[in-house]
Amino acid sequence: MEPTKLYPIVAVLSLVTVEYGGWALLSFVSARRGQLDDFQTQFFRAGHAHAGVLLVLSLVYFLYLGSKTDFAESTQWIAGAILLTGVLAQSGGFFLHLAVGEVGRGSPGTRLTRSGALLIATALVLLAVGIART
């Protein structure tokens, strides 16, 4: 199976987990009203929102990767892996910071979020180069 077919499947199935996470978060917040502080609420929302938006945007990325570039299949595999790893790292970093971070201080979670952003940027630049080359 080609990367531009498999990776979108992974992204769509991942969106199902994000939807479930949203439902679970809403249930958690509703049932435990007042038990989450502003810090926890903000990072829950940020992680969840980044995951959903970036996964939807990854679907557009894979359309362009497959139809607007002449990259070899191996390059498509690498580009897709970089993108999805970045999406997971950026959104996951918010949840990690929620678990181990402190208000106003850096943590492994904030470093993971930044690393994810760099991976996503790398994948986007790679796609732009591929589009420009064709």
Describe each model-derived feature in a short phrase.
Residues 1-134:
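Polytopic transmembrane helical bundles with strong interfacial aromatic enrichment
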